[in-house]
Amino acid sequence: MWFKNLTLYRFNKPFSIETEALETALADFTFSPCGSQDVSKFGFSNALGKKGSTLVHSANNRHLICVTKEEKILPAQVIKESLEEKVAQIEDEENRKLAKKEKDALKDEIITSLLPRAFSRRSQTRALILPELEMILVDSSSATKAEELLALLRKALGSLPVIPLSFKAPIESQLTEWLKNGSAPLPFEMQDEAELKSAADEGGIVRFKQQDLKEDEVLAHLETGKEVHKLALHFGQSIALLLQSDASVKRLKFSEEFRAGNDELGNEDPMARLDADFALMGSELVALMHALVSALGGIEETQA
């Protein structure tokens, strides 16, 4: 349940749907496994996984939702070889070349025949709806997966006025200033990893890892016009993260000490522990968002 990435969105209008109404709306789009002829299936699933029983899990007016996607695995090479074999057989028997339309029809037949025997894979994506911040945080490093989740949520609710979060000043400019100054605004602390890019399209990319970012070797690249597009940070003592210039957060990791905050509950009641961990995570992510918006100079006013 602990989020590992953040793709950030902001509501254009206040989100005021209560937990019960949200649960009802999502219920019409519940996930069901692939049938024999389904290529893929996509829908909402229990927010807390196998131990959960609701599509929405809420605490302190923060709502956790989850989507599950199942996809049949049909190797392109297998389809290609089967199609070539079938086309060659028919062309030999009928002594003619098949038209593209006929080949496409054969390909569809091959896929249909393979689907019942195909293996499938499942993936899950979670999102945290934060009405107090008018934000949605999607736990995904892929913008495509985040948009898939939002598209289904929009379909379930009828409308979903959200846009990607952006800031008043370019993030790369802010990160570059932090690196020049040798420190990030509190409560953030720079770590030992960064990616610098030239502002020119044809310019190079330089990556530093496990290196003191205050060294002259690193700062020299700023003098040549490069800007910081990725920067590893710590948020207080609770979270390690990689902040990117597109406002996404990768490699989000809650510290062991922070995650141990509910250890006194034990694991005798798994649902109680999950509920407590969700409340703990939600509160810290809200604090992180407040600090991030402040450190980056505020959200772009056109989104307000």
Curated annotation (Swiss-Prot):
Keyword Phosphoprotein: no
InterPro entries: RdgC
Keyword terms: Cytoplasm, DNA recombination
Pfam families the UniProt entry points to: RdgC
GO biological process, alphabetically ordered: DNA recombination; regulation of DNA recombination
Entry's localization field: Cytoplasm, Nucleoid
Main function: May be involved in recombination.
Record-given protein name: Recombination-associated protein RdgC
Taxonomic source organism: Shewanella oneidensis (strain ATCC 700550 / JCM 31522 / CIP 106686 / LMG 19005 / NCIMB 14063 / MR-1)
Organism taxonomic ancestry: Bacteria, Pseudomonadati, Pseudomonadota, Gammaproteobacteria, Alteromonadales
